[in-house]
UniProtKB/Swiss-Prot annotation:
Disulfide bonds: none annotated. It comes from Saccharomyces cerevisiae (strain ATCC 204508 / S288c) (Baker's yeast). This is Argininosuccinate lyase. It is an enzyme of class 4 (lyase). Pathway: Amino-acid biosynthesis; L-arginine biosynthesis; L-arginine from L-ornithine and carbamoyl phosphate: step 3/3. The modification Phosphoserine is found at residue 27. The keyword Lyase applies. One of its GO terms (cellular component) is cytosol. The keyword Amino-acid biosynthesis applies. It catalyses: 2-(N(omega)-L-arginino)succinate = fumarate + L-arginine.
Amino acid sequence: MSDGTQKLWGGRFTGETDPLMHLYNASLPYDYKMYKADLEGTKVYTAGLQKLGLLTETELAKIHEGLAEIKKEWDADKFVRHPNDEDIHTANERRLGELIGRDIAGKVHTGRSRNDQVVTDLRIYCRDIVNDTLFPALKGLVEVLIKRAEGEIDVLMPGYTHLQRAQPIRWSHWLSSYATYFTEDYKRLGQILHRLNQSPLGAGALAGHPYGIDREFLAEGLGFNSVIGNSLVAVSDRDFIVELMFWGTLFMNHISRFAEDLIIYCTAEFGFIQLSDAYSTGSSLMPQKKNADSLELLRGKSGRVFGDLTGFLMSLKGIPSTYDKDMQEDKEPLFDCLTTVEHSMLIATGVISTLTVNKEKMEAALTMDMLATDLADYLVRKGVPFRETHHISGECVATAERLGLSGIDKLTLEQYQKIDSRFGQDLFETFNFEQSVERRDATGGTAKSAVLKQLDNLKSQLN
């Protein structure tokens, strides 16, 4: 007897499948993760068949009992896989036949193709991961950033451009910046969820369902928002996977930059923060080392997720319309992307919630040259055009450097007035870091009131 008789597609074949081809073709080693979605889809699909009169109520009840038993086996990690189980669909159908008999189990696939079955499973799986895993994990990360920002609102630090000290900011302003990035990711994920939550079930292999199944009934039963209106698109569309993976790459780009900042801040040269032991590792040779491996892995794994997306895009770009086996290559990069993103969220949350801030070192890193813009603003308030004040302030910086002074605050009033006569005694009030940040109180700025408004706004967006 040919092994083809054990396959869903075996009737046309008389020869044996090459053993390597069987392994090459099989996807159960990774698509088993969709077992819940597959069983759920079959449960609703068979209800649709019963509604058409293609199954009796008794048959439907037996099928649903069998599906429930299979779910228990998977949940308990007791499902026995067979060598001929090609994928999660064939494994579940084979086991259903063992439990309730092949005569009834053989009706389950009536009018359904693995083409619409697998993409239905994928959409359910992605939806569940977004709702049950990604949303809570990302919200938790943002909430930790907000909580920390509120608690350390009075800590000042240098803000950087080009990795050069630029202007004083609040540490909470930095925390709020990444809370903002991640909140945008949170909202973007909701938009993707709306688009992916459409039902392809009932589209058949490509041409549609031969028995006129109620696709709206199937969609409602599976919690989809709508039905994909073209059967060719229904079975072939993988844009929702591309979009979800692109979302993952964008999030990982944000988390990589977040990690890079913290890696810099925790070096001995900066000393702004110290990671907890829970998120650090040591050296096998140098006993004194405390390495920020959690952050370095966040940065490094971003490249992995980028590769998942680009690899799948290369698989997808040249295939003809409707279903092709190339599409089997969607699952491994998708699963890897989603798992990596989830773990990265949890690690980042742990890092930020347990690190220690060295307020003294942050504030000691503030230097008076960072107030050069404030000096220019001082003259603006006296009616001098900003482009002129920018040049004057730059001349003050150059003069202090030429005289070997430690900062522009060390120039005397006489020296200032030689540069520009409009400087007055009150210019020295400019040299105050707290006042500098408090002047920047417009929406989005680093003043305390502005940062607190940012945090309140982020909270409202999460809710």
